C-alpha cells in the first residue's frame, strides 16, 4: 500500500443531499465515490463514464437507469449495476420515495491517471 493512501471508513448519512465519500487522488489511486439522493421525479443528469468504470449500489427507493437512448433497466434497493467505460447514462427516480445509491468510479484498466 502506498504511504499516501490509508484505509478509510466513512459513515453514510441520511441527509437529503449528495454526500462525497472518496475524492480521488491523492486520497485513492483514482477511485471516486459518493452517495446520491434523488427526490421523486428527479434525475442525476445524463453523463458519460468516459474512460472510467462505474458501479452503482442502490440502497433505497426505486428508479430507472437509462443507457444512452437505448436500454432502460429497473433499479432499486438491493440492486447493483456495473457500467462500462464510454457509456452515456442517467438515473431517474420513478418511485414515490427518495432514491438513494452509492456510486464508485475508477479508471478503466490501463488508465491509472483517472
Where are the predicted features?
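A short, N-terminal "cap"/entry segment at the start of jelly-roll beta-barrel domains
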Residues: 1-32, 40, 45-46, 113-114
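A short beta-strand-loop-beta hairpin characteristic of the jelly-roll/cupin
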Residues: 49, 53-77, 87
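Conserved hydrophobic/aromatic beta-strand scaffold that supports enzyme active sites
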Residues: 33-37, 55, 72, 80-82
